[in-house]
């Protein structure tokens, strides 16, 4: 029988980088087409975020050069603010590091894995370092970066510096990757950039394909989105560990000041109410009579905390004083049990909904501009819903765009999270289920699958509830599902109104053309019967038709459809 010490001889600590090196599929690196798209996604989202935060209209150029079979060089260049030299190894070589992961703020990337994951994938498939060229306006830094997967650290294997007489600013990265494939499919790079251009009409995006063809998605809006605002956590959306960890990191003088300063919707008055709720919970738990305990808890749930306290006579005042002392001590001395009591009380208390001023949707006008510029439809509409919350305190917002007809050939669902296209795992996404739940026939769309209709849905949040670290599918949460449905129905009503008018116009055109078709024969017959000139008879009937069947101006397409 083996001894415990022998069993643990192979025990080793694994770094984050080592874990994701072995489980690259969790980051979206699965399949030859998807892996290449994921690399582009990580680089482009970084570029867009950086440009917007710096107040720069994005110019992004993507080049894909074929070096051999399933072997490519990927180049992504932007005109962003650049990266300070000392941060290069951290940005490109350290997992779970970044400017967004630790902040309660809306952004395209959230986990601090993205671009370093792309660098690692390039490294493990080609063995080559990633070349980074960047400048913040001063000298140009050229660095070759690799990841030390054992230490989860970036390592610059070579570095050069160049003068910058023209004052160029931006970042260019070059990755060499193998076991990937470029195709113009709906899960490929071209489609990803096309969808990115629709949701980001302020960005100019260029793609040089492996065959040398240049594809340009021009900017259709000069408005730079306002940068999102960091938001404080809401009491209804935190766990015990959140409160405990935040308290021990806080520099505030007391737990009271910590709660008021670092959470939204908590004032001094609310802290006084919190003290009452914690006191009431302690007293209820000390009650031995089960029936009495249940009745008191029901009262507390209904919000009648004062009535609960009075039920314990003089006892409650002493307990209240003990709880009040918790609020006066240093937050770094808050115990786990006290943090549990705070969160338990939060769940029973009533708070205003969290502020939503930090959310930055695309906006109805920009959605229409993006859809019109890229898809060339005959009809377009957009709806941006008012912000809501899920999970008690996490703000989110839903917006929808519909594009119909024109150059659109068939139906398509364009899924986005914080303006980022979601190309994979559509079946498990709340957006897909919400779109499929709509009875499109009510809105004059006989068959959604064959209709020339594009549905765009963008979910905006400081914390998008993705189903996995691959960030390609949004969890089916009731509040989000319902908001998407409401937005879709609003937009679909507008489409229905447009189609109703279009069908009426087409019907009138068809009636008129049918009557005009038989007019020569009618005129000829009446000429024989009455002796009146044919032209005079035709002129009379033409005026009669025009007076009885008024036809609004129709497009050439509508006229052709009416004839058909």
Swiss-Prot record:
SMART domains linked: HATPase_c (SM00387)
UniProt catalytic activity: ATP-dependent breakage, passage and rejoining of double-stranded DNA
Record Gene3D superfamilies: 1.10.8.50, 3.30.230.10, Histidine kinase-like ATPase, C-terminal domain
InterPro entries named in the record: HATPase_C_sf (IPR036890), Ribosomal_Su5_D2-typ_SF (IPR020568), Ribsml_uS5_D2-typ_fold_subgr (IPR014721), TopoVI_B (IPR005734), TopoVI_B_transducer (IPR015320)
A Gene Ontology BP annotation from the UniProt entry: DNA topological change
EC number: 5.6.2.2
Isomerase in keyword set: yes
Protein keywords: ATP-binding, DNA-binding, Isomerase, Nucleotide-binding, Topoisomerase
The protein's role, per its UniProt record: Relaxes both positive and negative superturns and exhibits a strong decatenase activity.
Protein name in UniProt: Type 2 DNA topoisomerase 6 subunit B
Organism listed in the record: Pyrococcus abyssi (strain GE5 / Orsay)
Lineage of producing organism: Archaea, Methanobacteriati, Methanobacteriota, Thermococci, Thermococcales
